[in-house]
Amino acid sequence: MNIYIICAVRNANPERVHELRAYAVRLRSEGYDVHFPPDDAPQEDPTGEKICRVHRQAMRRADEVHVFWDVESKGSHFDLGMAYALGIKIVPVHCEKPDGPEKSYWKVMCAASG
């Protein structure tokens, strides 16, 4: 099974990236193929186009996306839209910031997975 992890990359807390990397390593040790954006995409891309292309290719192979949602991450919004459009199973793992009472993508993910 192929799993794509949606998480913040740019401006992400390095300690949090380390924790998420451990999650990816654990999934790999269980036999899953995992796309972890901080490690599996060329972060030195000056325009971001190559990053988007690499993510799109990985997303097309994904059976599931596991989401560590950070509402401030623009890349996470982009990736979630791809997953939703492709009809990939969305697994909400953690919401990085408290969610208010209003509509939100986190609530959409939780409702769609339930």
Description of each model-found segment:
Residues 1-114:
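Conserved catalytic or regulatory cores that recognize and/or transform ribose-phosphate-containing ligands
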